[in-house]
């Protein structure tokens, strides 16, 4: 994941996206909801710290499965390390959801 602020590079972090049989939606989005701690209603109350929801139930969020970052293992969300998820969450809070664009490409 590449993160830019006002057009300047801010960070590059490894992520996990959808595994076979699932999909991470591609496109440009604006976050519509933030949750410091969310629990999945679909996947056994799985913790989703620092969730940034961008389309339906899809979110960018932290994961405890750090060893799997860089691999396609999620149900469609974009997973980050907890520290990076927190940094991104705080950045979106400070910049404002309305000033944040999420672009997901293949």
Predicted regions and their residues:
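Hydrophobic residues embedded in beta-strands of well-ordered beta-sheets
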Residues: 1-2, 59
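Glycine-rich catalytic cores of cysteine/serine-nucleophile enzymes that process amide/ester linkages
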Residues: 2-26
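Generic structural detector for well-ordered beta-strands
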Residues: 14-16, 30, 103
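Active-site donor-binding loop signature of nucleotide-sugar glycosyltransferases
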Residues: 15-17, 33, 62
